[in-house]
Amino acid sequence: MITSAAGIISLLDEEEPQLKEFALHKLNAVVNDFWAEISESVDKIEVLYEDEGFRSRQFAALVASKVFYHLGAFEESLNYALGAGDLFNVNDNSEYVETIIAKCIDHYTKQCVENADLPEGEKKPIDQRLEGIVNKMFQRCLDDHKYKQAIGIALETRRLDVFEKTILESNDVPGMLAYSLKLCMSLMQNKQFRNKVLRVLVKIYMNLEKPDFINVCQCLIFLDDPQAVSDILEKLVKEDNLLMAYQICFDLYESASQQFLSSVIQNLRTVGTPIASVPGSTNTGTVPGSEKDSDPMETEEKTASAVAGKTPDASPEPKDQTLKMIKILSGEMAIELHLQFLIRNNNTDLMILKNTKDAVRNSVCHTATVIANSFMHCGTTSDQFLRDNLEWLARATNWAKFTATASLGVIHKGHEKEALQLMATYLPKDTSPGSAYQEGGGLYALGLIHANHGGDIIDYLLNQLKNASNDIVRHGGSLGLGLAAMGTARQDVYDLLKTNLYQDDAVTGEAAGLALGLVMLGSKNAQAIEDMVGYAQETQHEKILRGLAVGIALVMYGRMEEADALIESLCRDKDPILRRSGMYTVAMAYCGSGNNKAIRRLLHVAVSDVNDDVRRAAVESLGFILFRTPEQCPSVVSLLSESYNPHVRYGAAMALGICCAGTGNKEAINLLEPMTNDPVNYVRQGALIASALIMIQQTEITCPKVNQFRQLYSKVINDKHDDVMAKFGAILAQGILDAGGHNVTISLQSRTGHTHMPSVVGVLVFTQFWFWFPLSHFLSLAYTPTCVIGLNKDLKMPKVQYKSNCKPSTFAYPAPLEVPKEKEKEKVSTAVLSITAKAKKKEKEKEKKEEEKMEVDEAEKKEEKEKKKEPEPNFQLLDNPARVMPAQLKVLSMTETCRYQPFKPLSIGGIIILKDTSEDVEELVEPVAAHGPKIEEEEQEPEPPEPFEYIDD
């Protein structure tokens, strides 16, 4: 056994090259044991490597590399490993090889990423030897079937060629595509590179044996390529694959922005008829109404002459199909279907509201109860509670009246067809001026009904805002207009709101500043930013500044690194409200990206800024960035939740609520629990609201603490000595927990994994209730119906059942509160004589004997009852449209005997097109009527009598 390498090292000084080679081979064998000794002579080994004439210089490099590895000098070790060429065996499982490969990949990745950001002429050449090792690694991954590893490294090193090759060579191409798409959505932080990856994915999806159009369109939404989506839809219609086209349209509406959808609609409209065989005949630009009618006629004539044998009666069909697709893309269909689902399945427990109403004693809690009622009935059109308590409701005055009127917009969310009739009583009239608070609230309500789906109502609100003579009406009008025109970037709307902002009126300006951001949502419009930031730096009104702070952030929604320059300048501003705007801008620009740089910035501000509002906003913003990985949030904010600063604690609570909304995350709830007993009342308020955001729609089985929190809300509300702020939080929490008749959840991403824009905006503006209660209503934008709605080829709901393969109690509605029984008045005990006492004693003994005879029968009956209660089925059949919670989707399937087949997996949920495999007549689900005032009935007057001749006697 060798105890020293000195003898071998001395051979390196020999003249004979063979002896040196022999020494190197021996050293290579013992280097792991004697590296310390060899390191003293490593310069000799280096000299051998540098000697061009030495035959085994690669071997010298390998030995030198191993010595430097043991010394911890990884960079030198990597350089010599590269010099060793093929002698460095990437397939070896030693710690040395693993470490050097990791360093090699890191070094290569760094060079590739640096090169990617440089223009073509300035790119630095990459060491071919380095690339060689990385290529060997890729091959090793493919040989070992470690495809996910290869995809990960390929994306990190920006090697799209390897990325594509890996997917195509894998044994599960659809699985690898889904994995890659998920990586793109959640982990990729560079927008330009992400787009290149998506282009590759689109190419692979399209080249599959059976092209996966649904996923292609998901990629195209990310790429912001509406033209390609329109082309796919046209292609599907031409190929008579209508059901697939409808399914894609529903998915697009759920995931894409309004601008994207309107471009697709525009392209579909300007195509004439999809049958036209002339390639490239798509005319762009808006076609005026008169020409539109004549246009298709020309194309029909052309096709008739060009394509012989085409039947003329086939031409109107595609037009009808295109109209249906436009109806779906515009959101009209989805909104109608969700409204039907929410009305049909409304399961609100009015007892909760009644108890709260009886317990509240001041105007703040009165407003909170009105808001909670609107949350509980969001989209159900049921204003039963308000009708039953008109006298109580009438106590709302001034801005409370504004909030109460606007709450009708939340209750009737999506009830667009009768919106103007429903709200007629509250809207501004030409004849007599009504209450300004009521009219402003009415306009705000119209915006809430049509949020992110304005259509014709935008022009109505535009005119109302133009003609408004009162700052309160202008406030409501601006909010309503901002909501209805959300993300449209319409210039006329922007100009009118800007005019209202420049009037320098605090009340109008606050709403106008926020509305400007809503209209320009995610547009990154330089002019809008310049106008808004410029005015924010000039104005003296804090209210206007507050509105603009959120508005500026909204303009940068989803823009990621493109917003960095603006964020930098806002964060350096001396005005704390603009610094707060910087925090919101980080939240909006990087929402859902999990970007480390953004998180670091927010955490730094959270502990270093001198202003409490800025620190609170910074911590809240963490929730928006981390919502794709809610399990990470508790560890990020756990220390902040114990901060000495109550504003930071409040921010931590809200961040947990935003990030883990609807998940029932146990760690988050464990962090919030002690905060519900915080010595500072507004921290308790935040903890109560956040707990409801997390536990919305959770049951005792999915989240054991839900009932404990329900009781806590009730305790806080009914405690006469508790603080108003905590009570406000508890009342709102009750409303959030049972929102939408127990049929909605809150989720910041769509079912397909895209960031859900209305939800993000709704939650951000909701957090501003800290300054302005009426903004609480914005949370209704984030409510997503938890449903599976199956549709047939005519886009009607057929009668069909889904099978939920778990016990019904797992996802059941919570049991309603019991009406407390009235206590009987205690009777005063009367004096009893000794004789009567004896007589009663005898009677009792008689009864006892009789009871003993009866006992056996009754005991048997009791046992029977218990037996009946015991067995709970392991599955449940749900009727279409079905309430299916996100966690329940995994166990959902069609029944075995079902005649319908879904076009995409039921586990995704939402609106699903069903293919009918039977020729029998379909049974359809009857639509239900919406609630609310029925104005039409009142307007029907009796017909005038028949004309007759009046003869005077």
Curated annotation (Swiss-Prot):
**Does the UniProt entry include the keyword Acetylation?**
yes
The chain residues annotated with the modification N6-acetyllysine are: K310, K720
Record Gene3D superfamilies: Leucine-rich Repeat Variant
What residues bear N-acetylmethionine in this entry? M1
Compositional bias per record (Acidic residues), positions renumbered to this chain: 936-953
Q: What are the ranges of the PC repeats?
A: 403-436, 441-474, 476-510, 511-545, 547-580, 581-616, 617-649, 651-685, 686-726, 729-761
Sites of Phosphoserine modification = S290, S315, S834
Q: Per its UniProt entry, which superkingdom is the organism in?
A: Eukaryota
* Name of one Pfam family that matches: HEAT_2
Q: Which InterPro entries match?
A: 26S_Psome_Rpn2, ARM-like, ARM-type_fold, Proteasome/cyclosome_rpt, PSMD1_RPN2_N, RPN2_C
Q: Write out the GO biological process terms.
A: regulation of protein catabolic process
Query: A cellular component term (GO) from this record?
Result: proteasome complex
Phosphothreonine: residues bearing it: T273, T311, T830
Q: GO molecular function of the protein, one example?
A: enzyme regulator activity
Which residues lie within the region annotated Disordered? 277-319, 839-881, 930-953
* Composition bias, Basic and acidic residues: 290-303, 842-852, 859-872
Q: Which SUPFAM superfamilies match?
A: ARM repeat
Q: Give the UniProt keywords, A-Z.
A: Acetylation, Phosphoprotein, Proteasome, Repeat
The UniProt family comment states:
Belongs to the proteasome subunit S1 family.
Q: How does it assemble?
A: Component of the 19S proteasome regulatory particle complex. The 26S proteasome consists of a 20S core particle (CP) and two 19S regulatory subunits (RP). The regulatory particle is made of a lid composed of 9 subunits, a base containing 6 ATPases and few additional components including PSMD1. Interacts with ADRM1. Interacts with ZFAND1.
What's this chain's function?
Component of the 26S proteasome, a multiprotein complex involved in the ATP-dependent degradation of ubiquitinated proteins. This complex plays a key role in the maintenance of protein homeostasis by removing misfolded or damaged proteins, which could impair cellular functions, and by removing proteins whose functions are no longer required. Therefore, the proteasome participates in numerous cellular processes, including cell cycle progression, apoptosis, or DNA damage repair.
| Protein name, per record | 26S proteasome non-ATPase regulatory subunit 1
Organism this protein belongs to: Mus musculus (Mouse)
Q: Which gene encodes it?
A: Psmd1
